[in-house]
A protein has these predicted regions:
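Bacterial N-terminal signal peptides
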Residues: 19-29
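Intrinsic low-complexity/disordered segments
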Residues: 2, 32-34
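Short, Lys/Arg-enriched N-terminal segments with co-localized hydrophobic residues
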Residues: 1-9
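Enrichment for repetitive, rod-forming helical segments
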Residues: 2-3, 22, 143-144
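A structural boundary/capping signal
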Residues: 11-14, 34-220
């Protein structure tokens, strides 16, 4: 996950006060792992979506990615904002998240590229948190999932550091694909603080208002 100057750019003044809050949230996680992952019909139980609350500054490295690879940032408003969650899609999402977490070696951008922050597809098999998320989005889009329903998202993690994940918006809530865990959880059961995500209406980012979430115990 992003650290130092990199984290500061991604979070834009949202991080310094969150340590004690996260400690409380992580200790309080009360939902069961079974409830978080799958309902009786082979799909996750429905949960409340993550609501956006105005514009937010895009991470610098995302802007750089857009210059190098415009297609990674393009928004097609003709695509669905949310996808229908089916047993097949759920299995695909869970399997793909776990597979990419195994396939890609986690390395910092400084070790990988010699720079503080760079977003890119991990074509050489190495990457930071945002690179995992970009590849997951690409692979899911190749299966037919609406690109517009999959959003790069910046959070504050359990270590009070900036972190990037992929949010998949569905008719049963918003789910998080994360290189830190193989379980795919509803956004509000990850234990993270949600800072901002890509806009679904234009090339840009929207604020998530620092929404605080609880965590599900014993889910990896």
């Amino acid at each position: 996950p992003p650290q130092g100057q990199k984290g500061d750019d991604m979070l834009s003044n949202h991080r310094s006060f969150m340590g004690p809050v996260l400690a409380i949230l992580l200790a309080a996680g009360g939902a069961s792992a079974a409830q978080a992952q799958q309902g009786s019909a082979g799909i996750p139980v429905a949960s409340a979506p993550a609501d956006a609350s105005g514009d937010a500054r895009a991470p610098y490295a995302w802007t750089d990615l857009c210059k190098r690879s415009p297609a990674e940032c393009r928004v097609n408003i003709g695509e669905a904002e949310r996808v229908e969650m089916t047993p097949k899609l759920w299995k695909t999402i869970v399997a793909l998240n776990s597979r990419i977490n195994r396939e890609i070696e986690a390395v910092t951008d400084e070790d990988h590229w010699g720079v503080v922050d760079r977003w890119d597809l991990p074509e050489d098999g190495k990457g930071d948190c945002e690179d995992f998320a970009l590849l997951k989005r690409k692979r899911l889009a190749e299966t037919g999932v609406s690109r517009r329903a999959m959003l790069m998202t910046v959070v504050i993690d359990e270590e009070n550091a900036g972190h990037a994940v992929l949010m998949v918006r569905t008719d049963r809530g918003d789910f998080i694909l994360d290189n830190k865990r193989n379980a795919v959880l509803p956004w509000n059961q990850t234990g993270y603080v949600y800072v901002k995500r890509e806009s679904q209406m234009r090339t840009g980012w929207t604020s998530l208002g620092g929404a605080q979430t609880s965590t599900v115990a014993s889910v990896r």
